[in-house]
Regions:
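Anionic-ligand binding patches
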Residues: 1-4, 11-200
Length: 200
C-alpha cells in the first residue's frame, strides 16, 4: 500500500517511515504542485480530514494528513487549532510562548492543566475518509523554560501523566525516542500503524 503525505515536511515523512517500518505501507512526499489548504475548521480532526481529502483528490492516491496543537484548560482550550499561528505569524514559537505565559500570568501551577492533541486522517482518491485516529498527552504549563529541545510549546510543557518513566519531565527535556513514547503524536502514530493495514 502506498500513501502520499499531505505535507511537504521531510521530517514528518522520516518519522512516519520509522513508525511504519515492517508494515506493507510506503509513505511518499506529495508532488510540488500540491495545493495549500486553509486550516479553517474548528477541530484538529476536521482540519486533518480536510487536508487528507484535498491531497487524495489531487494525487489520485490514498493520502495522510495531520493536525495538532495545544489546549490549555484555564484558557478554555486555547490556542487549539490556532496553535501554530496564535500570536500572528505561522510557526513563530517564541511569540506564541510569550502569549501563552502572558495569558497565564498569576495562574497557579495546579490550575495550568493542558494537553497536546494530534489528529491523523487518511482519505481515498474519491474524497471519502478511510481512517481517523488521534492521540493526546496531559501535562501542565510551566512559568520557566524546562529543557533544551526547542519545538513549539515543548519548553513550557511538563508531562504529568502517572506511570511513565517520563512523568514529571518537560517535553523539551526528553530525547526524541522518549518523547515519541508518551507524546500525542507518538500515540496517534502507533494507532495509525495498528489500523492502517486494515484499510487495504
Amino acid at each position: 500500500m502506498k500513501l502520499v503525505l499531505a505535507s511537504k515536511n521531510a521530517k514528518k515523512l522520516d518519522e512516519l517511515r520509522r513508525f511504519l517500518a515492517g508494515t506493507p505501507v510506503e509513505v511518499v512526499l506529495p508532488p510540488d504542485d500540491l495545493p495549500d489548504v486553509i486550516e479553517d475548521r474548528p477541530t484538529f480532526r476536521e482540519n486533518a480530514a480536510k487536508k487528507a481529502i484535498s491531497a487524495a483528490r489531487h494525487t489520485g492516491m490514498l493520502a495522510l494528513a495531520d493536525d495538532s496543537g495545544l489546549e490549555v484548560d484555564h484558557l478554555k482550550g486555547e490556542p487549539g487549532v490556532r496553535s501554530a499561528r496564535w500570536a500572528g505569524a505561522h510557526g513563530d514559537d517564541e511569540a506564541n510562548n510569550r502569549m501563552l505565559l502572558q495569558k497565564l500570568r498569576g495562574v497557579p501551577l495546579h490550575k495550568r492543566g493542558a494537553r497536546f492533541v494530534c489528529a491523523l486522517a487518511v482519505a481515498r482518491p474519491d474524497g471519502t475518509l478511510a481512517l481517523e485516529v488521534s492521540g493526546s498527552a496531559r501535562g501542565r504549563i510551566l512559568n520557566e523554560r524546562c529543557g533544551t529541545r526547542d519545538f513549539g510549546y515543548d519548553p513550557y510543557f511538563l508531562f504529568t501523566e502517572e506511570g511513565y518513566e517520563e512523568t514529571g519531565r518537560g517535553f523539551a527535556e526528553l530525547t526524541p525516542e522518549e518523547k515519541l513514547r508518551v507524546s500525542h503524536r507518538g500515540r496517534a502514530l502507533r494507532e495509525l500503524a495498528r489500523k492502517l493495514p486494515g484499510i487495504a
